[in-house]
């Protein structure tokens, strides 16, 4: 496999044996300690791993954090990206020709403003966008367009609890987790160094799960 900075970084992580995927959203965001929260976050993390180890794999669901402004939702996704330059929250308009510049080189991309203003029309647009496994575009100075398999996943954050126009075809794309900052053990920015170390261990745990499954397709199955 060709050198990939995210893959190489992930492979260097050593898990200390402490379970964190189940508790991180409770700890920093005040989410419930439930099987649903655990399964949704684990699913999203497995999609993110598969997208860098197997670019272009199907990954059309979006983890959405729902809760009060100032709770640290965007910071959560930034820390989850491990390095700030692997994160982007610059995706504003899916119809913009520069949308691919917002995707390229990033691993986790937050779509906060679009989720907050979601409508039936934009819901269809977002579903279509999420379902793509590759993007075709021409970079600056290139002569021809080129297919590029996606290596990123998309996340959402909103302050609005009624943000999804539930319909038979699209609601499953959005996986909401409710947050309550008043129930968080600590704010995610109280100790950034500690939080970033916690997220490194979060991915170290995820890598153990990833390598334990020979059939990688099983990683995306909800077990409960």
Question: What function would you assign to each model-found segment?
Answer:
Residues 2, 58, 85-89, 95-122, ...:
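Feature primarily recognizes SF3-like P-loop helicase cores of small DNA viruses
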Residues 2-104:
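P-loop NTPase catalytic core of nucleic-acid-dependent motor ATPases
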Residues 77, 126-127:
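Short amphipathic alpha-helical segments and helix-helix/interface helices
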């Amino acid at each position: 496999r060709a050198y990939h900075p995210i893959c190489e970084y992930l492979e260097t992580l050593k898990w200390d044996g402490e379970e964190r995927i189940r508790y991180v959203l409770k700890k920093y965001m005040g989410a419930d300690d439930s099987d649903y929260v655990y399964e949704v976050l684990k699913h999203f993390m497995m999609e993110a791993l598969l997208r860098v180890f197997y670019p272009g794999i199907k990954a059309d669901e979006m983890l959405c954090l729902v809760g009060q402004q100032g709770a640290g939702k965007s910071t959560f996704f930034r820390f989850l990206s491990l390095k700030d330059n692997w994160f982007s929250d610059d995706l504003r308009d899916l119809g913009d020709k520069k949308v691919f510049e917002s995707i390229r080189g990033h691993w986790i991309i937050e779509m906060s403003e679009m989720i907050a203003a979601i409508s039936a029309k934009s819901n269809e647009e977002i579903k279509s966008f999420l379902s793509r496994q590759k993007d075709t575009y021409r970079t600056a100075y290139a002569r021809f367009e080129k297919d590029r398999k996606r290596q990123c996943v998309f996340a959402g954050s909103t302050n609005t609890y009624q943000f999804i126009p539930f319909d038979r075809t699209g609601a499953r794309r959005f996986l909401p987790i409710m947050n309550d900052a008043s129930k968080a053990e600590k704010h995610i920015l109280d100790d950034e160094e500690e939080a970033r170390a916690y997220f490194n261990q979060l991915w170290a745990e995820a890598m153990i799960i990833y390598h334990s499954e020979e059939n990688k397709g099983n990683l995306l199955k909800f077990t409960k």
